[in-house]
Amino acid sequence: MAVFLWKNLFQTTKGRILQQRRASLYNGAHDYDEELIKKKLQQFAGGSVNLSKEHSGIGILTLNNSRLMNAFTGTMMLELQERVTELENWKDGKGLIICGAGNTFCSGSDLNAVKAISNSQDGMNMCMFMQNTLTRLMRLPLISIALVQGKALGGGAELTTACDFS
């Protein structure tokens, strides 16, 4: 009976902690509107963020946008958030390796998207969206390694700071 209660308490506590990790850090701050920025980011297509999960419990997250030296497009920012959510729910995960396709880790954000998001509120929303995603990545209960081969500029350098090792 005591073992059952302990397991139940542990699962409930673990569930609450994971729910807190998923919650946006910026709900309402600076008029942050996550749904609005998601719609705007969808307009900037290209590249992908791929996740493969090995049976050993190691995940490999690959930034794949070689045309722009793995720069984050709007859809890649959205995919990164989706992959982090997937990792938060991965029960068998032990570690995560983040890498870039080709000879560049990540050259930051796609400057065409940044330029198109020209007003200060949208810029603030994009920054908060990525900060929220990177904070959730940092809080994952996995050992994370940024495998930096080549350049890590701007948002790419920020991505490395969300990892345990680089």
Residue ranges and their predicted role:
Residues 2-101:
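Conserved CoA-thioester-binding segment of acyl-CoA-metabolizing enzymes
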Residues 28, 36, 92, 100-135, ...:
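Glycine- (often His-adjacent) and acidic-residue-rich active-site loop
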Residues 71, 106, 155:
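Residues that form or flank phosphate/diphosphate-binding pockets in enzymes
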Residues 72-73, 109, 118, 141, ...:
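Short, flexible helix/strand-to-coil boundary loops that buttress conserved ligand/catalytic motifs
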Residues 75, 79, 129, 136:
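Charged catalytic carboxylate motif
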Residues 86-89, 116, 139:
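Secondary-structure boundary motif
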Residues 98, 110, 159-161:
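Hydrophobic/aromatic residues within transmembrane alpha-helices
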Residues 134-166:
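Glycine-rich beta-to-alpha active-site loop
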